[in-house]
Each structure stands twice: as structure tokens, then as C-alpha cells.
């Protein structure tokens, strides 16, 4: 058994998807930086209070933290960590880069990229695991700014200047046992002078995934029905413990290896965050009609196609049970359940993101209006996360690189 202690700091940790996967792979957290109180509440409950994943230094408060403030306030302490940190993991929030939303060039969140580089410069970890949306590799409007370069190029050049051998790649998480088409920019860096090169990470990740999944009884390709068929509303309902006036679904029997894997360590009788949305009769009737009559599954109903089907919202996708899901976002109204006239629950989204059922989400379920800029409710926490099952696989490969 490997008794070596592998140390990691998680930046922009969100609700903890990356930290969870690294924890499962045997990494020991030093601390995590997450600014949003909603996401931090989930991270704190699952991995700080209850799993003791983090050693957490006395000089750093266990509370929501802004990386820019951490860099300013604790420069001396961060520099003292040099030589003790194996890995700095994480990537800045995606809203400023994502192709799914409006790309905002002067978005203050984009400044977080440079705070990330500053942090790396101070701590000098052996390894870097950087994750972001695919849109991170695209420059802003070339017509307005002919000299614009993508942020990915900036990060790569800055890390190389700091003395890291880096390798970026676009990864589709559906190729790693996760029931979701989710393409992300992944960059691995190894500090110059250490054995190995960053290219090896992606080679090993690919060559070792089959054995990893087989060892856990999991398939490489997992469909939506494989992930959530035990969470049907028809299993029965009960009052939601943490959401007054709403009903939650009960567990059905495990039907797949994927369900067994994610349920195996849960002691919950009622699935956490499996609370059903309130739909008007008009909307429920619209959903029933779509399930019965709409001919195409897994493709967004958008634009002029909406009106004939009574869709008033911006668009919706009727999920195909026998395919992987589209990219899970923070907006619950994007997807219609494959067999029931309702949107997906937080727990169903979490299953598709590969969170185990023991992992409990905290704070509000949804938000809206101006609060959307401040709050990160449960749906958004799940939609923003790195799938733990991928992070688990990445964590095992990174341990190999640490050992040379």
C-alpha cells in the first residue's frame, strides 16, 4: 500500500467535484479556495467537516475565500508552502469564457486567471491540473480585436515562463464512464527538473481508463437510463426534508452497475436533493405532449420550433434515455426527463455528473433575477462541477507522475 502523502490545493473549488475525485484517488487536501458561500457550504459539509479531507493551515480561515484576497493577505505563508505541495488543481469560473453563455471580455472573473498564475508563482507545486470550458481556447471577437489571443494561450505561455512543461487537451468526459457529453479544456503541467513530461498524463489517462472502470464494475459508455432509472417519481413521494412545500422521490431498486457504484456508501433513505419542481398544469400538459409526440430525442427544441409545441421558455431538450446526456448546466429548465413530465432534479443531475449519493448538496435549490449574479444554488453547483469520476481517474495518473 502506498503510504506517501500526496498534497493538493484546490483553487476555485466550487461544491467540491474535483476535490472529491482527488480524495477518492488518495490525495490529501491542504486547503481549498472557493469564494461563493452557497458552493462553500456544500464543500464544507461533505469534505471539510465530515471527511476531514483537508489538513487546513491555522493561518487560513475555514470560510468562503476570494483568491485575489488570499494572494494579497497571505503571500508570506503561501511562499512558505514551496517544496511541500505536490499539486495545485482547479480552474477559474467559466462564465467569462463559456460558449454556452455570453462571453464577456472585461468580465472581472477573467482577471481570476492572472490571480491563478500569481498563486502558482508563489507556491511552485510539482504538478498543475487546470480545467476550464472548451470556450477557453477561443479568442474574443477578432473583428473588433484582430490581435486577440485565447486565454488558453496566455495561461500556457505564463506557466512555461514559470518553468513548467505543459500539455493541453480537450477531453470529452463521456469517454471516461460519465453519462454526459461534456468537453473541457484540461491542462497538465510538470515543473521542469522533475522526471516525466506532461504528455504522459493524457497517454496514461487513456490507456488506464478501461482497467479503472472494470475494477469498479463500470462501463466506458453509460446512458441516461443507466444513471437515473432508479429515481423515477413513480417510485413514490415524500415531503422534502429541507424544502418546505415540495415533494421528493424515493429510491427504486438498483438496476445498473453505475447506480450501485454511486449508491453504495449512502445511508440516506430519501435521496438528497431529489426534490421535484412545481409545474403548472399547462406546462405539465406541454411536457406530456412532448414525451408522447415529439419525434427527436436529445436535440434542443429552439427558435421557431418552440411555438407549435407550446414551449414558452428559451428552449428545451427531451432527453434520450439510451444516449448520454447533453452537457449538464446550472439551468434546470434546459432538460425534460425522458419518461416523466418534469424537469430533472438536482440529484438526477448529480448522478449524470457522477457524484455519489452520499454527497449532499446545500443552500438554495434555485435562484433568479439579480440574485443569479451572487448566488450559486444547488443546480448551478452541480452544473459547474468537474465530474468526480473523471477527477478520480486523473488523480491516480497524477500520483504516478509525482512518483516519476
Predicted regions and their residues:
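Short, solvent-exposed loop/turn segments at secondary-structure junctions
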Residues: 16, 38, 93-95, 134-135, ...
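Core alpha/beta nucleotide-donor-binding catalytic domains of modification enzymes
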Residues: 2-127, 133-153
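Short, well-ordered loop/turn elements at secondary-structure boundaries
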Residues: 27, 181-182, 321-324
Amino acid at each position: 500500500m502506498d503510504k506517501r502523502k500526496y498534497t493538493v490545493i484546490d483553487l476555485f473549488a466550487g461544491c467540491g467535484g474535483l476535490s472529491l475525485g482527488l480524495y477518492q484517488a488518495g490525495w490529501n487536501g491542504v486547503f481549498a479556495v472557493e469564494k461563493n458561500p452557497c458552493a462553500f457550504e456544500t464543500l464544507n459539509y461533505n469534505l471539510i467537516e465530515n471527511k476531514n479531507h483537508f489538513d487546513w493551515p491555522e493561518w487560513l480561515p475555514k470560510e468562503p475565500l476570494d483568491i485575489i484576497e488570499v494572494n494579497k493577505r497571505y503571500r508570506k505563508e503561501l511562499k512558505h508552502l514551496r517544496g511541500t505541495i505536490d499539486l495545485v488543481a482547479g480552474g477559474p469560473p467559466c462564465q467569462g469564457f463559456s460558449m454556452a453563455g455570453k462571453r464577456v471580455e472585461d468580465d472581472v472573473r477573467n482577471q481570476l486567471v492572472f490571480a491563478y498564475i500569481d498563486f502558482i508563482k508563489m507556491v511552485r507545486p510539482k504538478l498543475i491540473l487546470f480545467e476550464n470550458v472548451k470556450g477557453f481556447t477561443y479568442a474574443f471577437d477578432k473583428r473588433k480585436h484582430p490581435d486577440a489571443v485565447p486565454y488558453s494561450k496566455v495561461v500556457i505561455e505564463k506557466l512555461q515562463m514559470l518553468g513548467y512543461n505543459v500539455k493541453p487537451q480537450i477531453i470529452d468526459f463521456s469517454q471516461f464512464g460519465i453519462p454526459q457529453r461534456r468537453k473541457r479544456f484540461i491542462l497538465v503541467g510538470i515543473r521542469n527538473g522533475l522526471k516525466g513530461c506532461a504528455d504522459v498524463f493524457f497517454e496514461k489517462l487513456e490507456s488506464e481508463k478501461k482497467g479503472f472502470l472494470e475494477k469498479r464494475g463500470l462501463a466506458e459508455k453509460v446512458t441516461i437510463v443507466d444513471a437515473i432509472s432508479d429515481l423515477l417519481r413513480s417510485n413514490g413521494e415524500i415531503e422534502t426534508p429541507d424544502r418546505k412545500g415540495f415533494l421528493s422521490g424515493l429510491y427504486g431498486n438498483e438496476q445498473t452497475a453505475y447506480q450501485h457504484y454511486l449508491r453504495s456508501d449512502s445511508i440516506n433513505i430519501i435521496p438528497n436533493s431529489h426534490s421535484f419542481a412545481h409545474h403548472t398544469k399547462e406546462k405539465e400538459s406541454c411536457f406530456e405532449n412532448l414525451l408522447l409526440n415529439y419525434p427527436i430525442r436529445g436535440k434542443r427544441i429552439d427558435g421557431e420550433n418552440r411555438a407549435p409545441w407550446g414551449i414558452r421558455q428559451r428552449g428545451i431538450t427531451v432527453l434520450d434515455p439510451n444516449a448520454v446526456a447533453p452537457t449538464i448546466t446550472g439551468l434546470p429548465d434546459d432538460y425534460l426527463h425522458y419518461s416523466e413530465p418534469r424537469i430533472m432534479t438536482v440529484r438526477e443531475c448529480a448522478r449524470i455528473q457522477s457524484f455519489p449519493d452520499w454527497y449532499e448538496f446545500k443552500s438554495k435549490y434555485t435562484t433568479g433575477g439579480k440574485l443569479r449574479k451572487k448566488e450559486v444554488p444547488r443546480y448551478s453547483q452541480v452544473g459547474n462541477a468537474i465530474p468526480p469520476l473523471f477527477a478520480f481517474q486523473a488523480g491516480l495518473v497524477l500520483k504516478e507522475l509525482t512518483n516519476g
